[in-house]
Design a protein with these regions (language model features):
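Asp-based phosphoryl-transfer active-site loop
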Residues: 461-480, 656
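Catalytic cores of nucleotide-sugar-dependent glycosyltransferases that transfer UDP/GDP/TDP-activated
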Residues: 1-353, 357-441
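Short beta-strand scaffold positions
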Residues: 116, 138, 186-187, 364, ...
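A short, Lys/Arg-enriched amphipathic alpha-helix followed by its capping loop at the start of a domain
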Residues: 31-41, 268-271, 465-467, 484-496
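Mg2+-dependent phosphoryl-transfer enzymes with acidic/Ser/Thr/Gly-rich catalytic loops
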Residues: 619, 626-711
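Active-site phosphate-binding/coordination module
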Residues: 481-572, 667
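Conserved acidic, metal-coordinating active-site core of Asp-based
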Residues: 555-644, 649-658
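Non-catalytic pre-domain segments flanking phosphatase-related domains
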Residues: 414, 418, 422-469, 487, ...
Length: 711
């Protein structure tokens, strides 16, 4: 398992110490222990960051820590030695990938499964999975796209939150992880449908809800008439400590929405009269030396307490110990109080389960995991976290009926036992992983690669067939047949993905497609196969870019070709990072063999593609339309027989050869006559899109009959 940020150890978890040490740390430590106790699991290694910093315990500098039977923490150094927040780790993750490869290859041994937690570990897990061919399981915990939107909704400026949280990189990593993961474990249905559902690469069939468990030996109702635990360090803040206690326990993070909770309490006289408010939001010493985010949260809470003169009604202790938490829940239960979680978004809500196991009813945000928890446990109410009046109303309602409060208390204890125990979690998890190993292990090992690929949209991944066509004089040229082809594609979605392969640059390709009313393709192979982009967002395939880059010396090639007869560079808008394009005079141009010799003599390597007796493109040796399509087939795991490709000119030759289903449209250039007679190249009589449709009918492409006979 990979969980990289925060302070991770097997005892005395410092939950709430900072924004990175929260529920995820509890989750991964307890999951590792629970899996280690299972006879179905040989060993569990929880890999995290080794931290050497006098400000934190030396426990976090120990390379190995045993957690229990067959489970341990492995700490790997990467990035700064000191403890830093997770947003500062992104630039060091590639180093961790290399160190993990060394660690797994030399001393630890290869695991059967990788399980990454959060986006940073997802990035590392994705690279390891690609390189080693090991299936990847991923748990998101908190999703960048969801958090970003919530902060915007709360009034934060986009530029400011991008600087603070680096959302672009985080979201890109999450998309990439979704592409690679064999299984996504979520805590709630809402997490899959509304949160992961906002990502392009979610494959719902690979997402599974397995609610986390809790250690029920730690969290239980108060026993009989014993004195309440922790009363003294809370009661010193309160004038009437015997009143019902509204407990909020969380990290000091803006998304936890504590300021709005205090506003709701402060502005409702009835609620203030009925109950006390207890805020346990991490630990603080000198605010001047706190982390900026924590300082802002703590300062705002102190300001609001003072602004509304809540002294004697609100307890806001500076410090608490991990062992105090269970006693806090029992104290609130003993005083017929409530646990409140006002977070803007709560991916799961582990503290809600801890409270429920302690017999404490809950009132929580309606956004995220609390919906499932309250539905399963039937022990409280939900509210709109953006509406202070709704928060206050829900709290008053929950306190208004003693009989219902007692029923909620009993329901919560029972519900946790039925739905949130670790043994049940491990059983479901183990079954899911066994299915992944059976289904995907061989396929993943065939796809071992050392490059870090670009994200593929789910639309492409889920397609069983792909139609790829040139643009000029192939797809475009006749509006009537184009309309018929587009309708054919619409009716066959999502089984058939649509792509273009063109000599045009990406902007030029999008412009001409827009002029003809063609919807944006799922795949765009542009600049004669030197660039690949995917989906509506036009994500670039960086793996392809890295693959074609070796031996490409663009400036040197341009210098070597400068001034040669019969070659005139095309305008800058038609050039590309990996493409030099020329208009040619066939009568004066050197033969291609002579041009290649000219370049090789200068230590230069390039692919030369001549088309229509008018153009010459100079490309990296690893690039072409045909190679780009084969790269895609490799990434998708689709046989080339599932690709129908159509073209009309010389730069289409490579993609028309081989096992693809080739279609040459009726208005093709004479240079394609060399392909006549080949088994899988069909020469259509119809022109433009009509020729593509004719080829589709010829092959029975994407028809039920074709699906039965095509391997």
């Amino acid at each position: 398992m990979l969980s990289l940020h925060g302070l991770v150890r097997g005892h005395d978890l410092e939950l709430g110490r900072d924004a990175d040490t929260g529920g995820q740390v509890t989750y991964v430590v307890e999951l590792a222990r629970a899996l280690g106790r299972s006879p179905a699991v040989e060993r569990v290694d929880l890999l995290t960051r080794l931290v050497e910093d006098p400000r934190v315990s030396s426990d976090y500098a120990r390379p190995v820590e045993e957690l229990g039977p067959r489970a341990r923490i492995l700490r790997v150094p990467f990035g700064p030695r000191r403890y830093v927040r997770k947003e500062h780790l992104w630039g060091h993750l590639d180093h961790l990938v290399d160190r993990c490869l060394s660690l797994l290859g030399e001393s630890v041994g290869l695991p059967h499964v990788l399980h990454s937690h959060y986006a940073d570990a997802g990035y590392v897990g994705t690279q390891l999975s690609r390189i080693l061919g090991i299936p990847l399981v991923h748990t998101g915990h908190s999703l960048g796209r969801v958090k970003r939107q919530r902060l915007l909704d709360a009034g934060r400026r986009e530029a400011a939150i991008e600087r603070q949280f680096n959302f672009r990189r985080r979201i890109a990593a999450e998309e990439e992880t979704l592409e690679q993961a064999s299984l996504v474990v979520a805590s709630t249905v809402e997490e899959i449908e509304r949160q992961w559902g906002s990502y392009e690469n979610l494959r719902p069939r690979r997402a599974l809800v397995i609610p986390p468990g809790i250690d029920t030996s730690r969290f239980s109702p108060p026993a009989g008439s014993n004195a309440p635990e922790g009363a003294e360090w809370i009661d010193r803040f309160l004038r009437e400590p015997g009143k019902p206690m509204i407990l909020a326990l969380c990290r000091p993070a803006p998304k936890k929405n504590l300021a709005r909770l205090v506003e709701a309490y402060a502005t409702d006289a009835e609620l203030r009269e009925r109950a006390n408010l207890v805020l346990v939001a991490g630990n603080r010493d000198d605010l001047r030396t706190s982390e900026p985010e924590e300082r802002r949260v703590h300062s705002e809470l102190l300001y609001l307490i003072d602004k509304y003169d809540l002294y004697g009604k609100v307890a806001f202790p500076k410090q608490h110990r991990p062992e105090d938490v269970a006693g806090l829940y029992r104290l609130a239960t003993g005083r017929r109080g409530l646990f409140v979680n006002p977070a803007l978004n709560e991916p799961f809500g582990l503290t809600l389960i801890e409270a429920a196991a302690s017999g404490l009813p809950v009132v929580a945000t309606r956004d995220g995991g609390p919906r499932d928890i309250v539905a399963n446990c039937r022990n409280g109410l939900l509210f709109d976290p953006l509406d202070p009046k709704a928060i206050a109303a829900a709290l008053k309602d929950a306190l208004s009926d003693g009989r219902r409060w007692r029923q909620w208390s009993r329901n919560g204890i029972k519900g946790v036992r039925e739905h949130y125990g670790w043994p049940a979690h491990v059983e479901r998890y183990s079954k899911a992983v066994r299915r992944v190993l059976h289904r995907e292990r061989k396929r993943l090992r065939r796809h071992v690669t050392s490059v870090r690929g670009a994200t593929l949209p789910a639309r492409l991944i889920e397609a069983g067939h792909v139609l790829v066509t040139d643009i000029d004089d192939t797809l475009l040229g006749d509006r009537e047949s184009l309309h018929e082809l587009l309708e054919w594609l619409r009716l066959r979605a999502p089984d058939v993905a649509f792509g273009i392969a063109t000599g045009r640059t990406l902007p030029m390709a999008l412009a001409i497609l827009g002029e003809w009313g063609v919807p944006r393709p799922d795949l765009l192979v542009t600049s004669v196969g030197t660039e690949i982009h995917y989906g509506p967002s036009r994500m670039r395939d960086l793996a392809w870019t890295r693959h074609i880059r070796p031996l490409w010396r663009r400036a040197s090639l341009a210098d070597a070709l400068s001034g040669l007869p019969g070659m005139t560079p095309q305008p800058a808008m038609k050039q590309g990072e990996f493409k030099l394009s020329y208009d040619i005079d066939p009568a004066r141009l050197w033969p291609l063999e002579r041009l290649q010799g000219h370049l090789r003599a200068r230590g230069l390597h390039a692919r030369l593609i001549r088309s229509q007796d008018r153009f010459l493109d100079v490309l990296p040796v690893r690039a072409s339309k045909g190679l780009a399509i084969r790269h895609l087939a490799y990434r998708l795991g689709l046989p080339l027989e599932r690709f129908l490709v159509a073209g009309d000119s010389g730069n289409d030759v490579e993609m028309l050869l081989g096992d693809t289903l080739g279609v040459v449209v009726g208005n093709h250039k004479p240079e394609l006559k060399v392909l006549e007679g080949l088994d899988r190249v069909y020469f259509a009589r119809a022109s433009f899109a009509g020729g593509i449709l004719e080829g589709i009918r010829h092959y029975g492409f994407a028809s039920p009959v074709a699906a039965e006979v095509t391997p």
